Amino acid sequence: MDPVRASAREIARAVNAREVSAVEIAETMIPHVAAVDEHLGAYLTLTPDLMREHARRVDARIAAGESLPLAGVPAAIKDNMCLLGTRTTCASKILEHWIAPYTGTAVERLLAAGALPIGKTNMDEFAMGSSGENSALGKTKNPYDLDRVPGGSSAGSAAAVGGFAATISTGSDTGGSIREPAAFCNVVGFKPTYGRVSRYGLIAFASSLDQIGPFARTVEDAALTYDAMGGHDPMDATSVDMPFETTAGHLREDLRGVRVGIVKEFATSDLAPDVAAAYEAAYADLQKLGAELVEVELPTAKYGLSTYYLIAPAECSSNLARFDGVRYGLRVDGADVGEMYEKTRAAGFGPEVKRRILIGTYALSSGYYDAYYVKAQKARTRIADDFRRAFATCDVIASPAASSPAFAFNAKSDPYSMYLMDYYTIPVSLAGLPSLSIPCGSALPEGGSRPMPLGLQLASPLFSERALLGYAHAYERATQHAIKLTPDPHCHPELVEGPR
Amino acid sequence: MAATDAALRQAQGDTGLRRKYEAVIGIECHVELKTTSKMFCGCPNEFGGEPNTKVCPVCLALPGALPVPNAKAIELMIAAGLAFDAEIPAFSKFDRKNYFYPDMPKDYQISQFDMPLTQGGVVHYWLPDGTKKSCRLTRIHLEEDTGKSTHAGSGDGRIAGSSYSLVDFNRAGVPLMECVGEPDIRSADEAVGYLEALKRTFVELGVSDVKMEEGSLRCDANVSVRLFGAPEYGTKAEIKNMNSFRSVHDAIESEIDRQIAVIEGGGRVIQETRGWDEAAGVTHSMRSKEQAHDYRYFPEPDLVPLELDRAVVERIRAAMPPVPFERFERYTEKFGISVKQTTQLVDNPALAGYFDRVVTITNAPVATLNFVLGDLSRLANESGTAVIAGKVTPEALAELIALTEAKTINSKIAKDVLARLWADGGSAKSIVEGEGLAQVSDPGAIAKFVDDVLAANAESVTQFKAGKENVLKFLVGQVMKTSRGKANPELVEALLREQIAAR
Amino acid sequence: MATERIDVRGVARLARLALSDEEIERYGAQLEDLLKHVDDLKQLDTSDVAATAQVIESRNVMRPDVLVPCLDHDVVMAGAPQPQHGFFRVPKIIAEVG
């Protein structure tokens, strides 16, 4: 078994069966990842010693007779998730040297399930961005074309899995930050229903939207990872106290009887021709699997961006107030504490973060609160209602995850053009629905020379994770698009370390 | 325009001015709730300790931490509201109040804006002379306390002039009730009465310790004056930095005088915040320019709303003890106990509860009061134990009182029996019957004692007949001695007078 | 809605962000651009819906009043930018940092 290429399911089976030890897995991955990451830039911090320590613990537990769902599986953790003793930066200068003194619940559960922490991955600063370019601490590249962006905000987590520098990884999704980079990096990226995975330990961007979810190269691996992380947490008052329905092992293999909603307002004719063609083919593939395609309408989806870009910044302007130089993180001194605040935050936050803090503060401010924040929260209700109505006639909605494949660095200098990358994912986030992106083919990007991955977004009703992952699994089984593309030579598992 | 010293002095001494102007006062209090743990995390809710030793990711506002509300704090809040007849709405939620300050770990405070846990209500209280008063409540809401800053480098610990501050977050996150009173208060005495009522009620309910010196009660007063009969309120000033009920009283008095002096001097009162300077006995303006806060309130997205089930509210109401004011009315009006003694009892809820239980049995409140506040409390103080922790059960005391009321034993014997009960517990009746301590009231028997004593004290008889009244006391004492304390003293006195007159 | 100029300086002050004149201009323009887009919400009729507070329907999520171990003091102070005698030191507070 080759740990670099193997799936999480294969690795866990082999480690549990004691065919290979977790320590061996770790010792294989550590040099491999270091070598690949020289080119990929997925990680901000590599944690080889921690990985070895966890590997030893896993082996000891296996020896004592335990069986762990993710035994020995190499995992990358997005750097907005607290992991005790590791630098946790949110890719921001304001936390550049901060060491987390505790581990968040989802990560804790992942490691308790046997996963091995490779390191902390790069991201758009404080999860604000759709390309990874807003990181203040590193540059992550798309594993399929190192001159293109991996997507964001979970740039490094998507790139690591897509670039065979991790088997699974954790991401966070607020408006599309798992789904869009998954599409760009040719991997499965899954955002559960809001409240299914604890946010305790996830450094908050927008509290009512943030969710943690997995990246993996197969749907089953994503399911295994979600099963390990998810479930009620008393430390997070917004985590739902409902019986947790596991997903792996319950994944269907066809789509007979499934009604797939195709959104009238998300017409493929809006897209570039070969991108449109890829999606049309994807919809046809769904039909071939037995699904019935149904047209659904989401008339208010077009207000998603406006709604999101009022609510998310408002919440983040408040969530990021705590970065004030008093108790941790960067401090730039001032003659008085007010000056210290202003200088610290000016030096510590990048432009996109500042933009969102400004717009959010404005939207909440006296005289504007009703017109902006409250209005947006009402629009959100309308959007969620549209989805509810749509799900009366379909079981799952299919759409592009993004309007184009990965673009080149610096291609979108205008902030609003970047925001448009989340056009399809944002409405789903606003409704809190479970949603994922799964590789569905490729297209030649504008000005590009090689085809780049495309992702199909699937979204289903609240708390229907098992069904959703099932639909994706059926589609993946029949189409296997991911393996049809070859990553950049620096990331291709065949070419890096030679035969194993 | 500031008041001149002369004008101020004149105002302070001039009760005529006080008759001309009416003071209007609204009190805003912050009361720390007495829970084991903090409002949103499991750190200890305790006064004191080394700095920054009672903190966790949540109350320190580390990245990634999330709040979860303390169920007990909510329950105590509801009890507090019910104690003042406030309305407990069916639905309540938390909101974020956004502002930057070094002792605010999140740089926002989780508080309640438009849907507080209680609405309205009335605080009934009494003045030292027994006058009953009331002040309406606007609302009481739940929030979290901030950390504590100490200001260094200025020599006097005040912010102004300090060069740096040191922050301790042990207090950050402690649950806090904010009680906002309507401007129904009209004097410094009333303000103190109101605060005492709050304090008594919260202590009785176990909701808070309410110790101003420990910071578990902090209050600000909004003070304005107007001519009596004026339809509009005057401009108010907010007074802060009062550290005791005494300070509150003095600060309000001082501020009323100041405002009157300003107006009498032709000036206008400015709306501002003023700090009480205890040493100087005056308030100082705290702000150079008025800056309105934009708190940007919005519903707290990390918490879910509270739906307050009526059954739960009723359960809390049923478990509550009577409020102090209820006791005050019952004791002063129904039982005829003095305001002073009533206050004494009410200030000791455990003792008042004991008293109530005894009165339920004896139906003799005055007699009960005399025992409870008199000999029983004395015995308790001497042994350093609280009455309720002692061996005299309410039933035993009631029995003793019944025996006294029925004149089965006299007051001296009662005292002795009480001391025995305090030391050993048991039943008054058993002791009295067992040792034959019943008062001797048989006129024949007493007559015999009286005879013996008069025979042995002829000079005393002569002295009494000559007009020395207090000799009678001596003679009564002798009869008591002869009867080993058991003679009925009233009968003894009556018989003595009779017999002396007959001699 | 977004027709008048945004007081970027005022907003920046509320958010405790020091911005240069150039940044005020730049961010101001970008914010106004975003607000122009956001203006489309005016066309959406929201008169008969309630604002979403949370997408989940939970109520009354609370914790029992019990103690949980605190963070070790040394760990707490290890991350402090300027620890002093176990406190967090900050520059002088000008009375109303409101």
Go through each PLM region and give its residues.
Chain A
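Short glycine/serine-rich loop/turn segments
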Residues: L70-I212, E265, P313-A314, S399-Y416
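Acyltransferase
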Residues: A22-E27, R56-D59, T247, L271-E297, ...
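Serine-dependent amide/ester hydrolase catalytic core
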Residues: A12-R13, T300-G304, R322-L430, T486
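An N-terminal boundary/leader segment
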Residues: M1-R52, K288-L289, Y362, K484-H492, ...
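Residue-level signal for inorganic ion chemistry
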Residues: M29, M51, T103, A222, ...
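Immediate post-signal peptide segment of exported/extracytoplasmic ligand-binding proteins
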Residues: V58-P74, D221, L251-G261
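Structural helix-boundary/capping segments
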Residues: A35, E108, G163-S169, T174-A272, ...
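Long amphipathic alpha-helix in the N-terminal Rossmann-like dinucleotide-binding domain
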Residues: D49-R56, G114-A115, D124
